[in-house]
Amino acid sequence: MSFIKEFREFAMRGNVVDLAVGVIIGAAFGKIVSSLVADIIMPPLGLLISGIDFKQFAFTLREAQGDIPAVVMHYGVFIQNVFDFVIVAFAIFVAIKLINRLNRKKAEEPAAPPAPSKEEVLLGEIRDLLKEQNNRS
């Protein structure tokens, strides 16, 4: 089997394709959550605590000197990323809870009794024919 053919078979397996779709959707979901935090949650939160913009929180380790830029730790961006993480983690937690609940309901449903085998059907027909013959005599 050629290398390219093996790679194609590997790449087209169900699990790999599902994983790729999950990664793409996860990246898009991450952008949505980041926008939710940065553009919707943080501005009112900053307004509630005296109009503070968290992105502006920073600690200067060394001032700029000539052509050398300042060394700054932007801990406000870190705070915003922590909010992002908490919201994503909560959303994933809720989604997993819902999926587990649906799976539990499916597991609780009683399974349909198995259909009789061909032998059982034939034996039943033979029994019925014998009963019919006995009733005639």
UniProtKB/Swiss-Prot annotation:
The keyword Ribonucleoprotein does not apply. PROSITE patterns: MSCL. It is a multi-pass membrane protein. The chain crosses the membrane at residues 10-30, 76-96. One of its GO terms (cellular component) is plasma membrane. The keyword Transmembrane helix applies. Gene3D superfamilies: Large-conductance mechanosensitive channel, MscL, domain 1. One of its GO terms (molecular function) is mechanosensitive monoatomic ion channel activity. Keywords: Cell inner membrane, Cell membrane, Ion channel, Ion transport, Membrane, Transmembrane, Transmembrane helix, Transport. InterPro entries: Mechanosensitive_channel_CS, MS_channel, MSC/AndL, MscL_channel. It is found in: Cell inner membrane. Belongs to the MscL family. Homopentamer. NCBIfam families: mscL, PRK00567.1-1, PRK00567.1-4. Channel that opens in response to stretch forces in the membrane lipid bilayer. May participate in the regulation of osmotic pressure changes within the cell. This is Large-conductance mechanosensitive channel.
